[in-house]
UniProtKB/Swiss-Prot annotation:
GO terms for biological process: tRNA pseudouridine synthesis. The active site is at residue 57. Substrate binds at residue 115. It is an enzyme of class 5 (isomerase). This is tRNA pseudouridine synthase A. Formation of pseudouridine at positions 38, 39 and 40 in the anticodon stem and loop of transfer RNAs. Homodimer. It comes from Nitratidesulfovibrio vulgaris (strain DSM 19637 / Miyazaki F) (Desulfovibrio vulgaris). One of its GO terms (molecular function) is RNA binding. The keyword Magnesium does not apply. Pfam families: PseudoU_synth_1. InterPro entries: PsdUridine_synth_cat_dom_sf, PsdUridine_synth_TruA, PsdUridine_synth_TruA_a/b_dom, PsdUridine_synth_TruA_C, TruA/RsuA/RluB/E/F_N. The keyword DNA damage does not apply. The gene is truA.
């Protein structure tokens, strides 16, 4: 048998996450793992199991998910990238397929991961091309969010940022980066002679006058708990909206209780950006 590693990109909007779901009471929902295994099994003529580096949730995207699979030696030299992409739906794409040592494991060999969460600083209007990939939050206090983010750096017990439904051994993780950056160009508001914003639209007009751009938050760690990034993002947005002071973060970490932290951020703003080996 030969072990192959895949780099996979996908738009999670219409996918039920990475992992095949164990259910027999209803039709299996569409998953990334399921779509890839469907094609691999058709080529090999026998069941093929893929192992992903991260189990992204329903609605979460990926730019560079990594997975591995074992195939018969006589199938190892096929043009697997072309074969996958010829049969995959348009929301999943294989960027690369390479042969790796037999002992390589996409999940257990990973030293860390980087996720990006995108925010759109306006709630009344979102460009259609951004709507599936960014949380429209409205204007936020970025300085307060920066101050709160600083408390998340380093080794901590992140039990307050873990959702239920996992059997992990420890909730201690080391976060090496929580930082924001702007992406893309600001949409241009046409300068219309004598134009005045209508009632209720002043916030949008003022925001566009200042230049609207996507705010991307990068989270890097040696590993993440279930929905940990979305829960940290939910905290930072709550701080940005003035619902919590930045210095509330240490107490939330110390509590080790999910109920002490704000609500989970929506799935659609999150993208798995990179797996580190």
């Amino acid at each position: 048998m030969a072990r192959l590693a895949l780099t996979v990109s996908y738009v999670g909007t219409r996918l039920a996450g990475w992992q095949i779901q164990a259910r027999t009471d209803r039709p299996q929902p569409r998953t990334v793992q399921g779509e890839l295994e469907r094609i691999a099994e058709r080529i090999v003529g026998a069941p093929v199991r893929l192992h992903g580096a991260g189990r992204t949730d329903s609605g979460v995207h990926a730019e560079a998910q990594v997975a591995h699979m074992d195939v018969p030696d006589h199938r190892a030299d096929l043009d697997w990238q072309r074969a996958f992409n010829a049969g995959l739906p348009d929301d999943i794409s294989v960027a690369a397929v390479v042969r790796v040592p037999d002992e390589f494991h996409a999940r257990f060999d990973a030293r860390g991961k980087t996720y990006t969460y995108r925010l759109w600083p306006e709630r009344r209007w979102v460009p259609p091309r951004l709507a599936p990939f960014a949380w429209a939050t409205g204007q936020l206090d970025m300085d307060a969010m920066d101050a709160a983010a600083a408390y998340l750096h380093g080794m901590h017990d992140f039990a307050s940022f873990q959702n239920t439904g996992t059997d992990i051994v420890t909730t201690v993780r080391t976060v090496t980066r929580v930082a924001r950056r702007h992406e893309g160009e600001a949409p241009v508001q046409p300068a219309l002679p004598g134009a005045q914003p209508l009632a209720g639209a002043e916030e949008t007009a003022n925001a566009m006058a200042g230049g609207l751009r996507v705010m991307a938050w990068d989270f890097e760690a040696d590993g993440f708990l279930k929905q940990m990034v979305r829960n940290m993002m939910g905290l930072l947005v709550a701080v940005g909206r003035g619902k919590l002071p930045p210095d509330a973060v240490p107490a939330i970490l110390a509590a080790r209780d999910r109920k002490t932290a704000p609500a989970t951020a929506p799935a659609h703003g999150l993208t798995l950006t990179r797996v580190h080996y």
